[in-house]
Swiss-Prot record:
Gene3D superfamilies: 3.30.465.10, CO dehydrogenase flavoprotein, C-terminal domain (3.30.390.50), Uridine Diphospho-n-acetylenolpyruvylglucosamine Reductase, domain 2 (3.30.43.10). FAD binds at residues 26-34, 108, 164, 213, 230. The keyword Oxidoreductase applies. PANTHER family: ALDEHYDE OXIDOREDUCTASE FAD-BINDING SUBUNIT PAOB, XANTHINE DEHYDROGENASE SUBUNIT C-RELATED. The lineage of its organism: Bacteria, Pseudomonadati, Pseudomonadota, Gammaproteobacteria, Enterobacterales. It comes from Escherichia coli O157:H7. The keyword DNA-binding does not apply. This is Aldehyde oxidoreductase FAD-binding subunit PaoB. Its EC number is 1.2.99.6. [4Fe-4S] cluster binds at residues 119, 129, 138, 157. It comes from the Bacteria. Keywords: 4Fe-4S, FAD, Flavoprotein, Iron, Iron-sulfur, Metal-binding, Oxidoreductase, Periplasm.
Length: 318
C-alpha cells in the first residue's frame, strides 16, 4: 500500500469539494473493496476523504411512498429495515445472497454500487487490463474467461459487475442522487449509471470527478412476487455465475434483471414484455446481442434455465 493523506469532512459539499481539490483523492466509508485494492496497489489514492460522519445513514419514506436510502446505510441495516423486507423483498434477498454478515455490517449502499470487478486479470498487476491500465489490453479475451460477461462486452473488456444489490435495485428502477464539487445535485437512473466498456472500460460510471453519491431512491412498491435466484460455484459467499431478480404480478406480467452476465445489471425492458410468452421469449430478448467466449458459453444455457425456474416458481405461487 502506498502512502496517502487522510481527512474527515462534515458535509457532502465539503467532501465533493475536497475530492476535486486534491488530485488522486478517493472517498472512503466501509472500505471493504477499496482497502483490498489499495493493498494490491491497484488503487493508489494520494488522499482519503472519510465520509462516515456525513449523516447519510438514514432510510426515509419519500412523498411518493417510496424509500430514500442514504449512501452510508450499511447493508445489514438495509436488509433488516421493515419496509425493505415487506415491500422490496427482492432487494433484501439479493443483499443476503451477496456477502457474509461481517461484510454486510461494514459495506455501504453507495460502496456496493461502486465496487470494482472481480476479474482475476484486473487483480493481477502482471497482466494487461484496460480497466486497471487503459490501453494495455484485456488478458481475459484469450485467457480464463469462465466467469466473464456474455453480453454488453467489447474488444477492450469482458468483465462483469459483481454486485447482487445492484441487480435488485436496477429491477426496482432505483435512482442515484449525487452532489458535485460545485454544490449542484444530480439524479441518475441506475439504468444510466453504469457505462458500457466500449473503448474506455476504465470509465465505469456516469459520476463526474469529485461527485459524491448521497442517496439512492426507490419508487413506490410494485407488489407482486419477488424472487432472487443466484447460481454460483459454492453455496455461499461467492459471486454469481448467473443471477435472476424478478418481480412477477398475479396476471403474469412483471420484470426481470440478471447479474453475472454483463458489465452492469442486465435488464432489457423489451424482455419484460415477453414474460407472457415464457422463458424462451424472455431469454431471446435479453441475449439477442450475446457474444460469449468458448469458456463461458455455458452461461447462456444457465441463464435460460434459471429464468425458466424463476418463472415456474412465480406461477406455482401465484
Amino acid at each position: 500500500m502506498k502512502a496517502f493523506t487522510y481527512e474527515r469532512v462534515n458535509t457532502p459539499a465539503e467532501a465533493a469539494l475536497s475530492a476535486q481539490r486534491v488530485p488522486g483523492a478517493k472517498f472512503i466509508a466501509g472500505g471493504t473493496n477499496l482497502l483490498d485494492l489499495m493493498k494490491l496497489e491497484i488503487e493508489t489514492p494520494t488522499h482519503l476523504i472519510d465520509v462516515n460522519g456525513l449523516g447519510l445513514d438514514k432510510i426515509e419514506v419519500t412523498d411518493a411512498g417510496g424509500l430514500r436510502i442514504g449512501a452510508l446505510v450499511r447493508n445489514t441495516d438495509l436488509v433488516a429495515h421493515e419496509r425493505v423486507r415487506r415491500d422490496y423483498a427482492v432487494l433484501s434477498r439479493a443483499l443476503l445472497a451477496g456477502a457474509s454478515g461481517q461484510l454486510r455490517n461494514q459495506a455501504t449502499t453507495a460502496g456496493n454500487l461502486l465496487q470494482r470487478t472481480r476479474c482475476p486479470y484486473f487483480y493481477d498487476t502482471n497482466q494487461p487490463c484496460n480497466k486497471r491500465l487503459p490501453g494495455s489490453g484485456c488478458a481475459a479475451l484469450e485467457g480464463f474467461s469462465r466467469q466473464h460477461a456474455v453480453v454488453g462486452v467489447s474488444e477492450a473488456c469482458i468483465a462483469t459487475h459483481p454486485s447482487d444489490m445492484a441487480v435488485a435495485m436496477r429491477l426496482l428502477d432505483a435512482v442515484v442522487e449525487t452532489i458535485t464539487p460545485e454544490g449542484k445535485t444530480r439524479s441518475i437512473t441506475l439504468a444510466d449509471f453504469y457505462h458500457p466498456p466500449g473503448k474506455t472500460p476504465h470509465i465505469e460510471t456516469a459520476l463526474l470527478p469529485g461527485e459524491l453519491i448521497v442517496a439512492v431512491t426507490l419508487p413506490p412498491p410494485l407488489g407482486g412476487k419477488h424472487i432472487y435466484r443466484k447460481v454460483r460455484d459454492r453455496a455461499s459467499y461467492t459471486f454469481a455465475l448467473v443471477s435472476v431478480a424478478a418481480i412477477i404480478q398475479p396476471d403474469g406480467s412483471g420484470r426481470v434483471a440478471l447479474g453475472g452476465v454483463a458489465h452492469k445489471p442486465w435488464r432489457i425492458e423489451a424482455a419484460d414484455a415477453q414474460l407472457s410468452q415464457g422463458a424462451q421469449a424472455v431469454y431471446d430478448a435479453l441475449f439477442a446481442s450475446a457474444h460469449p467466449t468458448a469458456e463461458n458459453t455455458f452461461k447462456l444455457l444457465l441463464a435460460k434455465r434459471t429464468l425458466a425456474s424463476v418463472l415456474a416458481e412465480a406461477r406455482a405461487q401465484a
